[in-house]
Amino acid sequence: MSPELFSHRLIFVTGKGGVGKTTVALALGLAAAAAGRRTIVADIQGSGEQQEAELAPGLFRLSVDPQSAMDEYLLVKVPGPAAQLLRQSRLFAAFAMATPGMRELLCMGKLWELAQFERRTPDADAYDLVVVDAPASGHGAAILRTPRTFADIAQVGPIAHQAQTIAATLRDPEFTAVVAVSTAEEMPVNETLELRDALATGPDPLELQAVILNARYPDRFTTAQASAIAAALARTPAPADGVRSALSVALTEHARARREAAQAQRLSAAFGPRLLTLPYLFEPAIELPQLRRLAAELSP
Amino acid sequence: MSAAGLLEGRRICICVGAGGVGKTTTAAAIGIGMAKRGKRVAVVTIDPARRLANALGLEQLDNEPVRISAAALERLTAPDEPPLSGELWAMMLDPKQTFDELIDRLSPSPQRAAEIKRNGVYQQLSSAVAGSQEFTAIEKLYELAEADFDLLVLDTPPAHSAAEFLNAPGRLSAFLGGGALQVLLRPAGLGMRLLGVGAAPLLKALRLVTGVDLLSDLTAFFGLLGGMTEEFNARALRVQDLLRSDQTAFLLVTSAQDRPIEEAVWFRQTLRERGMPFAGAVVNRVNAPVPRGEVPLDLPTGPAFPPDLAARLDACLADHAVLAQRDATNIERLRTAFAGEPILLVPELAVDIHDAEGLLAIHRELFDE
């Protein structure tokens, strides 16, 4: 992988649901941490680690929750009695959480804060890199636009100001990179191409820095070999269940690998050297050792 | 148990699950199967693969159900089968359009509807905001429930978590229904006095944080909605009733991988807590166990089957045994959590699931044909 990706301060990892965004985000984080960069992988589900927790040496994890992001924001940003009043007001909480886009803005604010060398969170250490395990593509692209949208709607006041600052950070290609994760299947590839187009439009166009093709099935058999297997299957008498199902598994895998090759080709045509491929791991679960194998593939 | 058994007596089937587990395909296959059983079925899809849409005979986005043509149905029927006895209708949800139509329906006058649609807050709300797909999907379902269908099959929007489908519409409804927000925006509101907080300092603090324009935009928006907020609230309650009714069935769609299974177990629990009607689960892309009793297998020999091919085949089987074992363990976890509730398994298929042949194959698995 090009070392350029790891020179960013904020990497947004998005892609269709089920393609392995979390896996890839963690693998990127491990790769960066192994290269000596203090890294945090953050999601905005608010359901995981509520405190910055160390997952591996130099790699931290956090699940950002809009409610605590708001409390933090008010604490730091709003002077004295007003903050007190707002924090205690359930009406304000209801207002903030119900206002369309506010949850997303608060989460973006927290991610932005994580990526600052001067953290506003008291006693917090700085990170060299923040990897965001972002929501699925459609929502992911919308979230990247939220600060700009808010800045345009609110225009004046602290929220507008904060939103403008975040929006400027996001459109700075030195600071922020957007990475799409895909598998070599039709829908994820479609969504990746749509994401590229969606990011390129609007007032703050963005470009995909890299596309990571995750869980690529191995091309085990040549076409001739697959024909030999099919012929063997046709000759094997029905009662030989073991052999027949073994041959069928091989043919199913071959068909899948062929379909994947065609889809991988679409990605490769669209993204050329920006496309990186991770192998399918035939493993019972993806834990730290498996993540390390993937991280090695992504190392700068 | 087959999908037909699961849906016995239900008028609405809501396919929920984590992203990428095959909700759309499952919804379409269920629609086909029930139409074959003589039902008048409408499938509401959200952003299907183009070829899947084409397989259903849908050429373009249309926000109303379109009846699937006889020609398309023929492709969805095996050659030895009789023609479909029911009707299959399908549509692709257009969230913006659905939202606009809702405003049209609830507005006291066309002028008011036009003003609302021009409002900046509304435009954000109806298109850009997270949750608008979920909200409009349920809205569409509610609308179609009045129509003359035996069964509605709803595919739900892609989300990281299945619970988003349950939470997001409520957030939007609460916003549209006003509630806390309206009290806040009406400076002399009763709520303020009840809370014992002077309106002025709170509003001042709010202005400080949000900026005046956002506040005045919101005030303008709620001014336009006027009495419609009550209508939104009443509607939200009726929608909740519909979702909880025993005519409705939530169908959990998952793959056999760790995270989707965890999500499914958790989602089942959430449905139970909220008193939502549950039909069962569909586990897609299951890797069936591969017998590897004798290794190497008793394979054909000769020039057509050289030793290196046999070795490759064996490596392939070894890898698949790992996946099959993983899937079996995860399905067992699901069974334990479901305590006897039905689980349908669909194997990983050799065919491409996005075309008519694939749909037909999945339908056969789901309906035990």
Name each region found by the language model.
Chain A
Residues 30-90:
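N-terminal phosphate/diphosphate-binding loop that engages ATP/GTP or pyrophosphate donors
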Residues 2-4, 19, 23-27, 34-35, ...:
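Conserved catalytic-core segment of NTP-binding enzymes
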Residues 73-81, 223-230, 289-298:
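Short, surface-exposed amphipathic charged segments that create phosphate/polyanion-binding patches used
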Residues 80-115:
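ATP-hydrolysis module of ASCE/P-loop NTPase motor domains
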Residues 67-76, 94-103, 150-158:
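Flexible beta-alpha connector loops of hexameric P-loop NTPases
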Residues 270-300:
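NTP-binding/hydrolysis catalytic cores, primarily Walker-type P-loop NTPases
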Residues 16:
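P-loop (Walker A) phosphate-binding loop of NTP-binding proteins
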